[in-house]
């Protein structure tokens, strides 16, 4: 670079730093070491692998959407439980006014340590979310759900009044404010969203999410969760078979998917995933109906092996670590300190 250009650039950089503070602009010359992306586990081993980085990335916006009763809130509560186990502080903005503390506790959430807000309007919900993020004291915020973020004008109006585009404008404005604060404070913000049908669509999917297009653009990760079947024991339904597709991913290759079981009253069957993925990766050996690990038989039939893994959490954690290492998605967690029960799943 010529001397004139160098002087002009130096003057411009000095002016920028004077106006906006040191660090407003910097040269990526290798002195800034690349840090490992911090993540929060989803509570599903298969989904952590599908995300490519071992979990949901911190400092980013994540959208989870799907039909009714597909497991959206369950997946978020599982992630909240994982965050709390690693010393994280979580908040739940319950715009739907449907939070169930009993169910959350069954999934492993420390309800007494969870900050819960049940706002009256969409503006109030997003302002609370922004204030929590800017504080820097929160590790994860869940907003449930975008569809329930009703603008104040709509609440104060009469039934049947037309409020075209109000919610979309509200979301667009809020996300413009939120995105910078989220990155600076390294907070994970998860928006749960619902599906609607577009009228008159002849080609392509008629499904769309609520709240306009802003959330689609600002989200670093978008997850499409669907119920694919039921888990039965005789005539009794024990849970749902679930599939999650990574529709968008800015931190790893997208379009991967994970399948797992959600058991009623227990949540995601982590042990079931360990068995399936462990067999697939040749970490657990399967011969007929028998399963073995490190040359020793651990059970006959998947249900018996699940019980054995639940009773031996140290072996479960060992298998989990081997699977993550083999797939190159070891989690990098720096916030908080784990306690002695971190490796254990909640009791049924």
Swiss-Prot record:
UniProt keyword Cytoplasm, yes or no: yes
Top-level taxonomic group: Bacteria
Entry binding sites for ATP: 66-73
GO-annotated biological processes: DNA recombination; DNA repair; SOS response
Record-linked CDD domains: RecA
Gene Ontology CC: cytosol
Compartment(s): Cytoplasm
Effect listed in the UniProt record for changing residue 57 to R: In strain: MS11
The entry's keywords: ATP-binding, Cytoplasm, DNA damage, DNA recombination, DNA repair, DNA-binding, Nucleotide-binding, SOS response
InterPro entries in UniProt: AAA+_ATPase, DNA_recomb/repair_RecA, DNA_recomb/repair_RecA_CS, P-loop_NTPase, RecA-like_C, RecA-like_N, RecA_ATP-bd, RecA_C_sf
GO molecular function, one term: ATP-dependent DNA damage sensor activity
Annotated PANTHER family: MITOCHONDRIAL DNA REPAIR PROTEIN RECA HOMOLOG-RELATED, RECA
Family (UniProt): Belongs to the RecA family.
Task performed by this protein: Can catalyze the hydrolysis of ATP in the presence of single-stranded DNA, the ATP-dependent uptake of single-stranded DNA by duplex DNA, and the ATP-dependent hybridization of homologous single-stranded DNAs. It interacts with LexA causing its activation and leading to its autocatalytic cleavage.
Name of the featured protein: Protein RecA
Species the sequence originates in: Neisseria gonorrhoeae
């Amino acid at each position: 670079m010529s001397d004139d250009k160098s002087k002009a650039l130096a003057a411009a950089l000095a002016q920028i730093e004077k106006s906006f503070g040191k660090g407003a602009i910097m040269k990526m010359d290798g002195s800034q070491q690349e840090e490992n992306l911090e993540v929060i586990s989803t509570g599903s081993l298969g989904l952590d692998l599908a995300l490519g980085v071992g979990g949901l990335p911190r400092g980013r916006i994540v959208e989870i959407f799907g039909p009714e009763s597909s497991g959206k809130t369950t997946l978020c509560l599982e992630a909240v439980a994982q965050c709390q186990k690693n010393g994280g502080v979580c908040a739940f903005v319950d715009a739907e006014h449907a939070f169930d503390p009993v169910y959350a506790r069954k999934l492993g959430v420390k309800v007494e340590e969870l900050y819960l807000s049940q706002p009256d309007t969409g503006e109030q919900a997003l302002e609370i979310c922004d204030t929590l993020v800017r504080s820097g004291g929160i590790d994860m915020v869940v907003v449930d759900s975008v569809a329930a973020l009703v603008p104040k004008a709509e609440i104060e109006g009469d039934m049947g009044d037309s409020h075209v585009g109000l919610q979309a404008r509200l979301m667009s404005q809020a996300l413009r404010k939120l995105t910078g604060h989220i990155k600076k404070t390294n907070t994970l913000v998860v928006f749960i969203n619902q599906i609607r049908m577009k009228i008159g669509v002849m080609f392509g999917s008629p499904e769309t999410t609520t709240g306009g297009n802003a959330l689609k653009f600002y989200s670093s990760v978008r997850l499409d969760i669907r119920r694919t079947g039921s888990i039965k024991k005789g005539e009794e339904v024990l849970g749902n078979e679930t599939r999650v597709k990574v529709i968008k991913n800015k931190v790893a290759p997208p379009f991967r998917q994970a399948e797992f079981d959600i058991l009623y009253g227990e949540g995601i069957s982590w042990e079931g995933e360990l068995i399936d993925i462990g067999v697939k990766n040749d970490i657990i050996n399967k011969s007929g109906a028998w399963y073995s690990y490190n040359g020793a038989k651990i059970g006959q039939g998947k249900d018996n092996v699940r019980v054995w893994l639940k009773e031996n959490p140290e072996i479960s954690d060992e298998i989990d670590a081997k699977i993550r290492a083999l797939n190159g998605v070891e989690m990098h967690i720096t916030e908080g300190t784990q306690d002695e029960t971190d490796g254990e799943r909640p009791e049924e």
